[in-house]
Amino acid sequence: MKLSLDWMNDFTPLKEVGLDAILKKIAISVCEIDDATEFRPELDFVKIVRIESLEKHPSADKLQIAQVFDGSSKSQIVTGVTNVKIGDLVPLAIPGAKLGDKEILESELRGVKSSGMLCSEKELFLSEEGNGVWILNGLDQAEVGKTIRSFLYYNDIIFEVDNKSITHRPDLWSHFGFARELASQLRLPIVFNPFESLWNFDLSVKLPKVLENQNAHSYYASSISGVSVFPSKRKFQSRLQKCGVRVINNVVDVSNYVMLEMGQPTHFFDKKFLENQGGISLEVSFAKKGESFALLDETSPALEEEVLLIRNQGKPVAIAGVMGGKESAVQNTTTEIVMESAVFMRERIRKSIRSTGIRSDSSVRYEKGLEATTTLPVIRRALNLLKENGCSELKASEPVGFLHIPHKEVRIHTDIHFINAKLGVTLSQGDITDILERLHFIVSWKGEHLEVLVPKFRHNYDVTIPEDLVEEIGRTKGYDTIQVSPLLAEVKTPIRNLNRELERKCKTFFAIALKYHEVFNYSFQSYKENEFSGDPKLSVKIKNEMPEEQSVLRNSLLPSLLKNTRTNQDRFSEIKIFEFGRVYFNLPEPENEKKIFAFAVSLDKKSSEPDLKLLEEDFLKIKKEVESFLESIQIYEYTWKIQQETIFHPGANLCLVARSGKDGLETIVGNLGYVHPAILDSFELKKRVIYGSFEFERIVELWNQNRKVSRFVTPSQFPEAEIDLSILVGEKENTNVFTDLVKLERIPELKEGWVYSQFMGGNVPEGKKSVSYRFRLVNYERTFTQERIKEISDQLVILAGKNGFVLR
C-alpha cells in the first residue's frame, strides 16, 4: 500500500517532525515500511517558461529558435515543434534533467546553441499520447519559474507499507487512519478529521429505496443531482496517481479518493440507469448459480451462490464490495447518481473473492473487517469532495438504509500487575493511562484494576483481550526501551508423569529388546469389527458423516493390528508390531475410555498349520518375551490362567492375573493367545497370529507398587548350575502346572524354571506330549557340589511322581 506524506499532513502536522523521526517511529511502533521515496524528483529539473520570441533556424527549415524566460533568466532553445507561439507557457527540461533513459544536455543543432528541451506530456511520462509541446496557458497555478513537480503537486514522499504487517489493522488502510496512528505515537494534534465532515441534505431530492436484511452490517444510499462529469482537479489527480490509482473522472475519482483517505470503499451508480430498470430499490443478496453480468473490468464471470451482489429491482448491478457493473457505471453524460456506502461481512467478501478470482482495492479492505458506523460520515465527506472537485450545484437526499448493532462496545478489564508482568517493566497508572488515551482508548481505574473502552475503529477484531492492551502499551512505549534482563527460573524437582514414563519404558523395551515395530492407527473402525471384541451395543457412534468402515470408535486394538498384519503378510516372513491406543465404550465415566497396550506377532505359521508342537513353541516363545517385559518393569508376582475369550483359539489362550491395590485382590491385567481362525479368515490373513494386550492403567498401578522396592541382588560369585527334566503331560494340559508346583517347593537355590522344548509323536504315547523343563540354580554362599545338585534333582523327580507325571 502506498501512502502520501503530503496527504497525511492534511490531518496532522507530520512535516514538522522530520522524515527520519517518522520512519523510526513507524518501524518501532507501527509496521514495516518497504520504502520511502521522493515522488518523481526528476521533474524538479523541468520548469514552466514563457516563450518570448520565435525565429526560423538559419540552417534548417523544420527547426525554430525560441527565446524563453523562466522568471529569472532567459535561455535559447532549438525546437522542431510547431504548436507554440509567443507568450505560451510550456515545460522546459533544463540541462541535467533525466527523463526516463534520456539525459538532457546543452548542445548545438546545426550550429545553434540549445540549452534544454521543450517537452510534451508523453516525454514527461504523464500521458501515453502527446502531440506537440504541452501548452499550459490558462491552467490554474501555471506560473513562470515554477517546477512541473510543484505544479502537479508531486512534491511529496511516498511510503510503501508492507501489507502483511497491517493485515490485522483495517484502521491503518487509509491516509487518515495512518496519520491518526502517527499522531498518537508522535504526540501530534489532529487538525482535520474527515469523519466529522458536515453536509446539509436537500429534502427536495427524491429518496432511493433500500431493502433491509442481514446480508450487510450497514448499507446506505443517497440520491445526488447536479452532477457534471469532467476531468478531476489537479490535486485529486495528483494524489490518486501518487498512490498508483488510475484517474478516470471527477465523480469516480472521488470514490477512490474517499477510500484512500478514510479506508471505506463507496460506489456510484448512474441514477438514470437504475430508474430505467423500474425504479430504485437496492438490496444486498446472493447470486444465483450461473448468473452473470458485465463488470467494470469488461469480464462477465459465471457466479456461484456464495457471491454477494447488489441488486436493483432484483437485477444485479454490482458484486458487493468487489466490483461494480459496467452498465450501471457513471458515464460522461451522467447528471444524477446514487451513492452507495456500505460495510459487508468480511467472511462473505472473502468468499466472493475466492469464487470470482477478483481482488480489488475495495475487497482488500472489506476482507479485513471494517467498522460499520462509518457509512454515514463517509457519505458526508464524499459529498464535500464532489463539490470541491467541480460539482458546485450538488444536491443530495438524506441517506436511506440500515445499520445493525449501532452501539457495540468492547470493554476490557485487567490490572496493572498483569500489564507489568507481561511487559517485564514497571509502569505507573499514569504511564498506562497516558499511552492508552493517546491511542483513543477511554480508561477508568478502580484501585489497581482498570476498565478500558476500545475505540470503535479498533474494536471489531483487533483489540479484544487484555493481551492486546499489553501489545498496544509495549509498542507505543517502544520495545527497544525495555531493558534486557536474564531469565530466572526456579530450580524444582520435576513432577513425574508415571503414565508417560512407563509408556516410554514399554515402547523402548518392545522396540529395542524384543525388536518389535510400533504402529499408529486411527480410532475409527466399523461396527462389525467392534463385534469381535465385546458387546457392539456399547459402541460409540461418530456423529459426523463417515463411511461404514469408519462409523464407530474402536473398542479393541485387535482389528487395527490385524489389518496392519494383513498389509504386511506378503512382504515379511516375521511380523512383530505393537500399539499404544485408546478404546471407547458407551458407558459412564471413567469406564467410557481405556488406554491399551497391545501387540501382534505372525511367525510364518500358516493358519492351517497342523503341527501343534511348532505352534506351542511359538506361543511359549512369545510368553517368555512377555515375562521378560514384566520383569523389566519390576512386576514379578503374577500367574497365567486359562480363560476362554471369543477372540482367541479355544485351546491357546491365557490371561495374566496379578494382585493390585490395598486389598490385594486378583485382577486380570492382560491376555495372550492365538487369534481365532474365524477372525483370521474374516481379515483374509494367511498365517497364524498371536495377540496380546494389557490394560495400561493396571500395569501402571502394579509398576507404581513395585518401583520403589529395591529388588537388587548381588550377583553370586559362585558358578550357576542347571537341571533339565523331561516329563509326559497331557496333550492339552497347561505346561505351567509343573513349574507352579516347583515354585511351591521353595527350593532356596532355585532361581527360575521354564519350558525349553516339547515333542509329540515317535515313542511318546498318544494323547501325551514330552515337555522338557530347565531349572536355573544359584548359590550365594558356596560352590555347588554334585551331591547338592543330585538332591535337588531327586526332589524334582519325586515331586513329578507324586503329582502323576511320568519321567521321560
UniProtKB/Swiss-Prot annotation:
Name this polypeptide is given: Phenylalanine--tRNA ligase beta subunit
PROSITE patterns the UniProt entry points to: B5, FDX_ACB, TRBD
Listed PANTHER family: PHENYLALANINE--TRNA LIGASE BETA SUBUNIT, PHENYLALANYL-TRNA SYNTHETASE BETA CHAIN AND LEUCINE-RICH REPEAT-CONTAINING PROTEIN 47
Keyword list, A-Z: Aminoacyl-tRNA synthetase, ATP-binding, Cytoplasm, Ligase, Magnesium, Metal-binding, Nucleotide-binding, Protein biosynthesis, RNA-binding, tRNA-binding
Presence of the UniProt keyword Membrane in the record: no
Enzyme class: ligase
Domain B5 residues, every copy: 407-484
Cofactor note: Binds 2 magnesium ions per tetramer.
